[in-house]
């Protein structure tokens, strides 16, 4: 219903914002990361929103970035994960860190979020891993570097490059870093860790 709301920030606490737009005050539930980055009371803000409707509950959720909103929508698509749990995840880890945790089966990182136990974390990974990998691999395949690797190399290499792209590296940067460390006998986590070490060097 609402893609985003732009207006004056009237109030914020650790759970929600109130944004006034055209004389209407919208209560928008959000994450701690959005709360900390949204700005000061009285400033004009833009919040990407999602209208959550279930039986007798209608709530508006919103985030500072489209990336946060995308992860929120992915999370609430998981069986047993509601909007409050999704917000809890986004309060604990960034969207890129979340995507990397899912791709690399990192249950420990997901359970840092309040209310997310091991079983729920495993379910999140099970239900979202292919979706996130497909999104990143599609972007990668459309790049010149991706076309070369996906035609000739293993899926492990492509997945490692995909994980680096989740962290914000370009296809060219990710491909170069992975190619420099890749060996067929490595697992995904080792490839990613070694590639990140290479990227961290000046």
UniProtKB/Swiss-Prot annotation:
Disulfide bonds: none
Domain of life per record: Bacteria
SUPFAM superfamilies: DNA helicase RuvA subunit, C-terminal domain, Nucleic acid-binding proteins, RuvA domain 2-like
CC per GO annotation: cytoplasm; Holliday junction helicase complex; Holliday junction resolvase complex
GO MF annotation, one: ATP binding
Record's keyword annotation contains Translocase: no
SMART domains, sorted: HhH1
InterPro entries per the UniProt record, alphabetical: DNA_helicase_Holl-junc_RuvA_I, Hlx-hairpin-Hlx_DNA-bd_motif, NA-bd_OB-fold, RuvA, RuvA_2-like, RuvA_C, RuvA_C_sf
Compartment(s) where it occurs, according to its Swiss-Prot or TrEMBL record: Cytoplasm
UniProt keyword annotation of Iron-sulfur present: no
Region annotation (Domain II) ranges: 65-143
Record's function text: The RuvA-RuvB-RuvC complex processes Holliday junction (HJ) DNA during genetic recombination and DNA repair, while the RuvA-RuvB complex plays an important role in the rescue of blocked DNA replication forks via replication fork reversal (RFR). RuvA specifically binds to HJ cruciform DNA, conferring on it an open structure. The RuvB hexamer acts as an ATP-dependent pump, pulling dsDNA into and through the RuvAB complex. HJ branch migration allows RuvC to scan DNA until it finds its consensus sequence, where it cleaves and resolves the cruciform DNA.
HAMAP family assigned to the protein according to its UniProt record, in alphabetical order: DNA_HJ_migration_RuvA
Subunit structure: Homotetramer. Forms an RuvA(8)-RuvB(12)-Holliday junction (HJ) complex. HJ DNA is sandwiched between 2 RuvA tetramers; dsDNA enters through RuvA and exits via RuvB. An RuvB hexamer assembles on each DNA strand where it exits the tetramer. Each RuvB hexamer is contacted by two RuvA subunits (via domain III) on 2 adjacent RuvB subunits; this complex drives branch migration. In the full resolvosome a probable DNA-RuvA(4)-RuvB(12)-RuvC(2) complex forms which resolves the HJ.
The family this protein is said to belong to: Belongs to the RuvA family.
Name of the protein in its database record: Holliday junction branch migration complex subunit RuvA
Organism: Acetivibrio thermocellus (strain ATCC 27405 / DSM 1237 / JCM 9322 / NBRC 103400 / NCIMB 10682 / NRRL B-4536 / VPI 7372)
């Amino acid at each position: 219903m609402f893609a985003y709301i732009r207006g004056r920030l009237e109030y914020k606490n650790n759970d929600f914002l109130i944004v006034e737009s055209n004389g209407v005050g919208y209560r928008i539930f959000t994450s701690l990361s959005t709360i900390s980055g949204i700005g000061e009371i009285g400033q004009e803000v833009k919040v990407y929103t999602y209208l959550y409707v279930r039986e007798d509950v209608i709530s508006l959720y919103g985030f500072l970035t489209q990336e946060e909103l995308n992860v929120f929508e992915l999370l609430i698509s998981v069986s047993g994960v509601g909007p409050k749990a999704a917000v809890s995840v986004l309060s604990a880890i960034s969207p890129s860190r979340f995507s990397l945790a899912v791709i690399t089966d990192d249950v420990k990182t997901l359970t840092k979020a309040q209310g997310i136990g091991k079983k729920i974390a495993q379910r999140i990974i099970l239900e979202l891993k292919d979706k996130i990998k497909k999104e990143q691999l599609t972007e990668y395949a459309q790049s010149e570097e991706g076309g070369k690797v996906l035609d000739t190399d293993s899926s492990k290499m492509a997945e490692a490059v995909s994980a680096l792209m989740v962290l914000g590296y370009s296809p060219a940067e990710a491909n170069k870093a992975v190619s420099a460390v890749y060996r067929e006998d490595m697992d995904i986590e080792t490839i990613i860790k070694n590639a990140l070490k290479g990227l961290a060097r000046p």
